[in-house]
Amino acid sequence: MLATDASPPVPLNVASPDCAEEFFAGAAVRCVTLRHAASLAELREVLERCLDDPAQTVTLDLIGHSTRGHRLLRLGRTPIDMLDPHVAGFFHALARDQLLTRLQVTAVRLLGCETAVTDAGQRTLRMLSHTVRLPVFGTRKPLFKSHSNSAGFDPAFAHILIEAAATRAGHGAGPVRSP
């Protein structure tokens, strides 16, 4: 099999329970496989349980509301802010333990409203990418249920994502294609 024949990564959808049900509710089937994590500890548990799943490349899609002001993704009550030593330590531990590598994660996407528009959001994207040594994407627009399909985030809307590295080159110089 050639590298170009590889199938695209599938999303590993992990949502904050405070938004998941209302966000994906409706007549259209959206995000069929959805796991919940209301804290970083629960996120770790979800990821460890996924080690038993069949091997395949995945994007780790963290789904939740963003905070007011800084627009940081929130899992439960915890904003994903890499300046917070607890949050940074959590992701350092994931990297040290190679948990994302063992899960074949190829990218992390912080799927909440406008998680890549503020300086704080862009800094978190860059620091998280540096820590986990993977591309990390945030959103440039508010997210709605229409941005999802049965698998999760709809690739047709990849243009509203921006990769952490692109935020260095002039505050979101343009989208970098999301996996």
Q: What do these predicted ranges mean?
A:
Residues 44-71:
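Short, well-structured hydrophobic secondary-structure segments
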Residues 1-13, 31, 56-60, 102-113, ...:
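Hydrophobic beta-strand segments of well-ordered beta-sheets in folded domains
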Residues 26, 46-48, 123, 149-152:
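Surface-exposed beta-strand edges and their flanking turn/coil or helix-capping segments
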Residues 31-39, 77, 81-89, 156-160, ...:
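A signal for specific C-terminal beta-sheet/loop modules enriched in small/flexible residues
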Residues 138-179:
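Caspase-like cysteine protease fold
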